[in-house]
């Protein structure tokens, strides 16, 4: 689907900054975080651009990506414009030791206007993308639990008899989890603790505690909101007045904090959903194997039945012959 493009990287950047400030001044940080959870591998700028063009976005891909999945873009659909990284070739002159000048092409990372489409703008083969929710997590609990524990690299988890759901010993890198929690309580607690480990492992970005005293807790809750909104879990309730009350210049600086939040969300969600997807595929293979074994058994019985019938007929004829000879 060809579409005339009048946007530039510069105009999209200006639009993204304008929309970002508009959302932040309207107190819509949580809306940005929700989109971030849906698309953790995109930048905050692109989250805002996509959000402004399609507020109810679910899942976006490039045209080639949808074609690969057996889906095509419906007629009269406009692409969602984003800022996309790309490799561009530049010619550069070199002079060798003999003074000869020659030109060599080199590739550099650059930015260009990209185009994506939401799944609602496409049609075709059913797209079995992973829709993680409480039911899926409960069904593949062990895979989910192990994924979260592995994501908190350097930490070990111990399940003990204690009153609080969790206690973290940062000095010895141990997370103590209350033994006997329900599946829902345990998964939420593990997500909370793993998110805290990941937030603490990142270097400071953007606004610091000099400007906002509890910035670490705000980053932590922002990451939890993005992660849990994607997974369909109960969302954290946190106070973001300190961010809403920042100046426009400081809010633009806060985008760097959100990039840190995005990095944490992407790492946890990628590991978590990959683990569950592998578990689902493993179950599908196991189910397929059982079905194939049942079909093979049924086929064997179908072949065996006529042989037994034929053998029984021969035995009956032989018995009659013997009876005749005796008479």
Segment roles from a protein language model:
Residues 1-304, 320-327:
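N-terminal accessory/interface modules of nucleic-acid-binding and processing proteins
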Residues 306-320:
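Arg/Lys-rich low-complexity patches in intrinsically disordered regions that function as generic
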């Amino acid at each position: 689907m060809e579409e005339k493009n009048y946007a530039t990287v510069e105009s999209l950047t200006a639009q993204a900054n304008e929309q970002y400030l508009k959302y932040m001044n309207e107190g819509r940080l949580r809306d940005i975080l929700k989109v971030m959870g849906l698309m953790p591998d995109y930048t905050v700028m692109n989250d805002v651009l996509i959000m402004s063009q399609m507020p109810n976005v679910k899942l976006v891909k490039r045209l080639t990506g949808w074609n690969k999945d057996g889906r095509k873009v419906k007629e009269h659909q406009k692409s969602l414009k984003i800022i996309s990284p790309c490799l561009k070739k530049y010619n550069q002159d070199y002079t060798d030791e003999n003074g000869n000048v020659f030109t060599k092409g080199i590739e550099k990372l650059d930015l260009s206007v990209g185009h994506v489409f939401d799944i609602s703008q496409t049609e075709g083969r059913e797209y079995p993308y992973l829709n993680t929710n409480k039911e899926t997590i409960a069904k593949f609990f062990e895979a989910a639990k192990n994924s979260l524990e592995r994501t908190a690299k350097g930490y070990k988890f111990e399940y003990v008899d204690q009153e609080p759901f969790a206690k973290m010993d940062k000095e010895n890198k141990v997370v103590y989890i209350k033994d006997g929690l329900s599946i829902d309580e345990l998964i939420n607690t593990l997500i909370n603790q793993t998110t805290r480990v990941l937030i603490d492992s990142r270097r400071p970005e953007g606004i610091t505690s000099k400007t906002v005293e509890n910035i670490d807790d705000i980053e932590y809750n922002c990451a939890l909101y993005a992660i849990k909104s994607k997974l369909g879990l109960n969302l954290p309730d946190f106070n973001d007045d300190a961010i809403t009350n920042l100046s426009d210049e400081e809010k633009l600086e806060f985008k760097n904090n959100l990039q840190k939040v995005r990095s944490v969300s992407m790492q946890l969600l990628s590991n978590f959903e990959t683990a569950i997807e592998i578990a689902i595929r493993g179950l599908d293979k196991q189910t397929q194997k059982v079905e194939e074994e049942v079909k093979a058994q049924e086929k064997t019985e179908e072949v065996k039945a006529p042989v037994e019938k034929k053998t029984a007929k021969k035995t009956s004829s032989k018995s009659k012959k013997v009876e005749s000879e005796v008479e």
